[in-house]
């Protein structure tokens, strides 16, 4: 449907069933705006002159404008932008489009555009867009992972937590239970992250007032997605205006409920602050990317559905990089009240998946993000591939016993479809990270479906090992699928299956003797080359949407090792603030003491594959040990390192 409006906003015409065909080859001649003839070209730095004009029109509040901050964020309005355009025309003797301030919305981008015009290049410059090549059957590479889960602020911390079976459940503080009455009875235990309200709004170019109105799920996603991109070695400037997709699963309306019930009520930022579309849209806007941007809500399968959609988008060449994740923050009592009345919650807050004492699921919160690329592209660009996604499938329970009742045959059909899409035989799969919520009804249904789909077709195969991360960090609801995927990636990467937490006695409602399945009562080695380790991941939404993903480990092609450095190498670090730089240096000290990478590679990545900030530090050394010693010496003599007072909510060094 196409709607046409006039300048006053009145609907003039409407067209339905319009089809648009776009050719794959996109080489377009873009005419430059006409120059005003016989006018003298200005001298001096173009961007400095733009900044000076901004200061004139906005005032002293914009005396030193950030060249990468949007004009509206700096204080211009749609009305003042018109005057700004006229000032630019007078200053640079150019005839500019009325939309120039919208098309090039920062000093740097506008400056680059005007510099091109002033260089008297040809009026038409061909712009080639690499549309990529669809690859329906291609594998998708996981090139980076980042997370903020209960007591695990990184994938490495999550792996350690699972091996040690750390208990993450605790009482929910009253500040998280907005709307609850003291006399109400419902389970008040959950697995929570530390200070979800912490946020460095200045880093993300957001005003303090707007940040307060933002759902913490938006804030948390921004931070974790940034860390994932840093881990992938993709600087922000490489993403600008590129086909980068953002796919995120989210389901909680807690913050909206909290705002509507507060004395302050709604403000001008409530719309974007509480909108699900803004969860992805804000990240795409901050990064300046132009790929698909979709917030997905299929309840507990939301983030794994986002993985499925992102992989299909990459294979169809709709995007070249996909930022995929899930987020869930507990900010009110509403779900505790509802699920408590339904009898779905474990009284002690623990998801005792597959155990005989299973009595409901324990709630959890957090955020996980992965960076995906087509495998061929990731290998070509020498990205650090963690695992490869072979295929996936999504379906619905259909007409079953009830809207929220799992459907075993539907789960079997789902797994069979995923296997076919991935080109994998059931016997090749040795491990499944199950949905496994610890409910009386759900666990036996899922285990039976896993046996039927994976081992009836290959009865001579070894038992299929089944596990669930929900017993470690709780059921993260919309973010549960991404947590399961990250765990599965760690399992195939390390070749080791973590023990199933809170497993005392296998569920006696399950006929284990008739099933070719087993549980990890203790840590188990998974021998063989990484690419031989094939795992499945399941997520089921409580309204019937089911997803299954198949992935395997990855071995990078052998390359000749770099010769030992014959001269000192320079390690260049940068961060947005002095405190963050000190924290980053400390993290590098720990990293350099444990890494097996050569110092040349580390220094190259730090310089070329990280976003550069204004606070810089350079140290040199012959090897990793000397680099770490140089950083320690700087930290010992740095006032900010010795007396660090980080900003509130500053959780990552890169922020």
Identify what each model region corresponds to.
Residues 1-33:
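C-terminal active-site-capping segments
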Residues 3-6, 102-150, 181-183, 197, ...:
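Short, low-complexity connector segments at domain boundaries
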Residues 22-33, 44-131, 512:
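Phosphopantetheine-dependent thiolation modules in NRPS/PKS and related acyl-activating systems
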Residues 567-574:
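Short glycine-/aliphatic-rich beta-strand segments at the starts of folded cytosolic domains
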């Amino acid at each position: 449907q196409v709607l046409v409006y006039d300048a006053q906003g009145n609907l003039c015409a409407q067209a339905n069933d319009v089809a648009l065909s776009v050719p794959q080859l996109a080489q377009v001649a873009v005419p430059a705006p006409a120059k005003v003839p016989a006018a003298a070209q200005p001298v001096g730095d173009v961007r400095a002159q733009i900044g000076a004009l901004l200061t004139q029109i906005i005032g002293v509040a914009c005396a030193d404008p950030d060249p990468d901050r949007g004009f509206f964020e700096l204080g211009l309005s749609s009305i003042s932008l018109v005057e700004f355009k006229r000032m630019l025309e007078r200053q640079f003797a150019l005839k500019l489009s009325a939309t120039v301030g919208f098309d090039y919305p920062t000093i740097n981008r506008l400056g680059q555009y005007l510099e091109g015009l002033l260089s008297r290049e040809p009026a038409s410059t061909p712009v080639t867009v690499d549309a990529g090549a669809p690859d329906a059957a291609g594998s998708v590479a996981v090139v980076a992972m980042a997370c903020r889960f209960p007591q695990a602020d990184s994938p490495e911390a999550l792996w350690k937590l699972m091996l040690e079976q750390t208990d993450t459940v605790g009482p929910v503080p009253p500040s998280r239970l907005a709307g609850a009455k003291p006399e109400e009875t419902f389970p008040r235990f959950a697995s929570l992250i530390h200070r979800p309200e912490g946020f460095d709004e200045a880093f993300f170019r957001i005003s303090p007032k707007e940040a307060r109105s933002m759902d913490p799920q938006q804030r948390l996603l921004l931070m974790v997605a940034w860390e994932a991109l840093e881990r992938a070695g993709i600087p922000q400037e490489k993403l600008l205006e590129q086909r980068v997709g953002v796919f995120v699963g989210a389901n909680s309306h807690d913050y909206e409920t909290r705002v509507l019930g507060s004395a302050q009520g709604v403000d001008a930022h409530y719309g974007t602050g509480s909108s699900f579309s803004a969860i992805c849209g804000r990240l795409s806007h901050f990064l300046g990317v132009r790929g698909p941007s979709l917030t997905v809500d299929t309840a507990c399968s939301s983030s794994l559905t986002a993985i499925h959609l992102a992989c299909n988008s990459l294979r169809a060449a709709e995007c070249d990089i996909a930022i995929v994740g899930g987020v869930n923050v507990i900010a009110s009592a509403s779900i505790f009240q509802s699920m408590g009345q339904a009898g779905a919650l474990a009284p002690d807050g623990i998801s005792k998946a597959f155990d005989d004492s299973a009595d409901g699921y324990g709630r959890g919160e957090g955020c996980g993000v992965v960076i995906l690329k087509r495998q061929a592209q990731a290998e070509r660009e020498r990205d650090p591939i963690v695992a490869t996604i072979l295929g996936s499938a999504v379906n619905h329970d259909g007409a079953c016993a009830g809207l929220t009742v799992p459907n075993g045959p539907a789960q079997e059909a789902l797994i069979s479809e995923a296997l076919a899409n991935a080109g994998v035989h059931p016997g090749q799969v040795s491990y499944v990270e199950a949905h496994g919520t610890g409910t009386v009804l759900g666990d036996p249904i899922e285990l039976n479906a896993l046996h039927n789909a994976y081992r009836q077709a290959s009865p001579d195969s070894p038992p299929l090992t089944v596990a669930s991360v929900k017993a470690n960090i709780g059921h993260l609801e919309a973010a549960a699928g991404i947590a399961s995927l990250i765990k599965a990636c760690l399992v195939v990467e390390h070749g080791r299956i973590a023990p199933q937490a809170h497993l005392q006695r296998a569920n006696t409602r399950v006929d284990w003797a008739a099933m070719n399945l087993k549980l990890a009562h203790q840590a188990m080695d998974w021998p063989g080359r990484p690419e031989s380790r094939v795992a499945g991941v399941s997520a089921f939404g409580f309204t019937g949407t089911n997803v299954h993903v198949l992935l395997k480990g990855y071995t990078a092609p052998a390359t000749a090792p770099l010769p030992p450095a014959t001269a000192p190498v320079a390690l260049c670090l940068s961060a947005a603030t002095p405190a963050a730089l000190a924290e980053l240096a400390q993290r590098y000290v720990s990293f350099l003491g444990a890494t097996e990478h050569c110092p040349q590679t580390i220094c190259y990545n730090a310089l070329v594959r990280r976003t550069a900030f204004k606070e810089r530090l350079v140290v040199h050394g012959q090897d990793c040990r000397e680099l770490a010693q140089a950083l320690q010496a700087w930290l010992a003599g740095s006032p900010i390192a010795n007396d660090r007072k980080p900003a509130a909510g500053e959780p990552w060094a890169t922020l």
